[in-house]
């Protein structure tokens, strides 16, 4: 605080430096200047506590392991990095010891692990210098004291939860009901769903919006030209070999964001920007995210328009810009708009990132950039580290030799590749350029097919599987199959009709449509697994869609197991709601949930990715599903339902019930009510299914069952994350924001467990806390991932 009692926020610095010259790039040395009054000032630096190292460490070398194509200056091409360390033991320096990601080094009781490295960084501000990276490495240091005891305690608690939820209630229940007869089996009342309806729903969702075939001449050029052969063309980019369709989708997302320009496919727009750039100079193609950036840009465009007519036209155009976020490069290059962008660039919190994205879009749309990125010609050797070649490196070979010599054009061919094959590629590209300029769809389609065949022929031995490339293009062309949310919505409607109005046929149809949606979502997950060559859980799009698929898997298993119980249909309903919301988010929020396939960060190349991450996101799906049934219970109580609840231990009842439908709980009376609690059994009579109090018991039982499963999975996932963190970073817990809020979610459900034992209105409090727990979980996934910076976040 200053002399007048004011306050000043201090910026947090993760690394401590004594002077500006020692500061790491991307971690500037910026102490806060505080006015103490009387002309006195002081510099205050808020940072970590600095302690002396236990031993001297020297960085002997820094090694990079890369993906396909080697290191290109892009962080995405890095697969792993290794520091070669030497330690001073007093008697001299040791031999170099490798310290890699997920492979820490122990020395004298201390663990050293890779925390950061110096990635490439572009100059974004005036006076800043661009860096190719590789200037330093950052090592973490930990002592791991008591780690094994902590982890043993965590594992023991997981085992204890499983015993408390599953084993103990079963033992108590069987003792109480040893003398009771098994309940009668429910008559199989499901009616076979209409095959025609199911097929129609599936076809309606998966069908692309393909117009009816008409005379080719009547179609616009972007619809008439056949770009399907390019779907089997590989492009080397960011350390991967992508299909051209996937590649174009990624590149165009940098320009137009989630929007499609004039209804064109990303493949067509990429080629059209490359071959006809003049057509887009004043076209609205650059996407600007958020009202905070759009409003000042729109005001600058309107203010720069001279004359009443021009101003009115600008106002109308900017009204559309504020709605859809697309603006033309010509408008962005107006001096008044550029001045506004420079001002916005200074606002590091609200608009600097958006300005950086606009600058990136303006660069990506340039024909020179687009041509240089078309690395479609495989190298002459089988070495995966070799860079592929762009069409720009061979296209001049299509020019007549005499004319090229007269014009001074260099026709130097690529070394090691048959000149005839290179000329075939160049000739096909020239034919495509000429046909595109003439807007001749038939000739362009023929040239596209020739180009695809010619690049395949250059080196078939290193070319990826064309079937996989084709399916990858198909996957992106069909919106990543996120339209399956429509099928889940249809399932929800039918299931609600069947469950609320006790309409057996609607319930059967709803379960059938849920089965179709589940199969379609399974196909989407498996297809992405195949085309990406890794399990899809390493970015937000994959985490959200795969988590909902896990929830649907669980629901499908429970529905099969309990198909003759009154609870039939409720798990399918909650899973349908979960998957519908997840796929809707993926479909309508492609900026936040980027569907493009990229390489994983180096730290994710570990078996724990497939254990810890899958368990955590599975628990999140079950938490959301529990919130759906809890919301149903709250609605039931709001509509005047009695304060009924399922007797404790809902999941144990599933273990006891089996799949035959024989009642393990309560005989003809439905759910067992006992003074001492015990496992809740889903009874077989109509009263349990929908009579007075029965609906509340079912909803509470479903919530309790899903909550118990998610409770154990969440805690197990947190423990597994601690094991992975200790394995990778030398410490099991670092108070990272996402770690903290995952723990907060667990605490809410731990509170739920204990509150349920003490309160009288168990069903109400269970539902309220289940909804609160889901809110904390969603806060963890949304705010922590996209707003707050941390090891697990995308901020």
Model-predicted segments: where are they?
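Secretory/export targeting leaders with adjacent low-complexity proregions
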Residues: 1-3, 597-600
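Membrane-interfacial, low-structure loops and terminal tails that flank and connect transmembrane helices
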Residues: 175-202, 640-702
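Fungal N-terminal intrinsically disordered, low-complexity regulatory regions
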Residues: 476-478
